[in-house]
Regions:
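Inter-lobe coupling linker of SF2 helicases/translocases
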Residues: 1-90, 186, 201-205
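Phosphate- and divalent-cation-binding pockets in alpha/beta enzyme and binding domains
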Residues: 41, 101-105, 167, 198
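Conserved helicase ATPase core of P-loop NTP-dependent helicases/translocases
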Residues: 93-95, 103-106, 110-144
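Active-site-adjacent loop/helix micro-motif of nuclease/hydrolase catalytic cores
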Residues: 118, 126-128, 148, 163-170
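Short, well-ordered beta-strand core segments
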Residues: 137, 155-157, 175
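A short beta-strand element within the Helicase C-terminal
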Residues: 148-161, 184-188
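A conserved SF2-helicase RecA2
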Residues: 163-219
């Protein structure tokens, strides 16, 4: 009776030999070309893009803008994301950091006529993700990387990377969890010769990428 009652609240009971049998994980690193804007800013610490002036007058602001120049200001990465989303009609989760990245990813999904769900600091709406097999779920790390069961999908694309190891590791577990019966696929969009390569290396070591590491790097 207790099990029946718990089932009504969403509990799942499994045989003992099923509990630890998680599916295989396959990781794919997609290297995208860097831009002349990134190289100029890295050298001069100053650049104007459209009407936005980026000034890296401290190590923290330089690190921030190098991250943004690797993602939201890199049209090569945008094109790579579009290609990936075009290649599947399955549910896909896209992790990102900044609001401008969200706007760019939304625009791509709209052009591809993909239904969207979002989890971020402003909104949490999983309706399309639950109901549409081809939905793209846009997840901001702080809001979506921990605690959620998103195993309706088995595919995650990393448009940009977090700095915190815990967010990175937990984000992968949103699909790789008990009850998932499909192989889990992860795609990392990494800009060549950029800060992203350093961040990815540190995250894979289960360490946070800090301002101190940035200052000690050759970037």
């Amino acid at each position: 009776r207790l099990k029946d009652k718990l089932r009504t609240h969403g509990a799942i009971f499994m045989k003992s030999d099923e509990v630890f049998q998680l599916p295989k994980q396959i990781e794919n690193i997609i290297k995208v070309d860097n831009t002349k804007e990134y190289k100029k800013f890295n050298k001069d610490r100053l650049i104007k893009i459209d009407d936005t002036e980026l000034v890296g007058d401290t190590s923290l602001t330089k690190m921030l803008y190098l991250r943004q120049l690797s993602s939201q200001y890199n049209s090569n990465k945008t094109a790579a994301l579009k290609d990936l989303l075009e290649s599947t009609n399955d549910r896909v989760i896209v992790f990102y950091n900044f609001d401008k990245e969200l706007e760019i990813i939304q625009e791509i999904c709209n052009k591809l006529e993909k239904p969207i769900s979002m989890i971020n600091g402003h909104e949490k709406n999983l309706k399309n993700f639950t109901e549409c097999n081809d939905c793209v779920l846009l997840g901001q790390y702080q809001a979506a990387a921990m605690g959620l069961n998103l195993q309706l999908s088995n595919k995650i694309i990393y448009f940009s990377l977090p700095l915190q190891s815990e967010l990175f590791m937990q984000s992968k577990k949103r699909i790789h969890r008990i009850g998932q019966d499909k192989t889990c696929f992860y795609w990392y969009l990494i800009t060549k010769n950029s800060i992203e390569e350093q961040i990815f290396k540190i995250l894979k070591q289960r360490r946070d990428y800090t301002n101190k590491l940035f200052e000690e790097s050759d970037i």
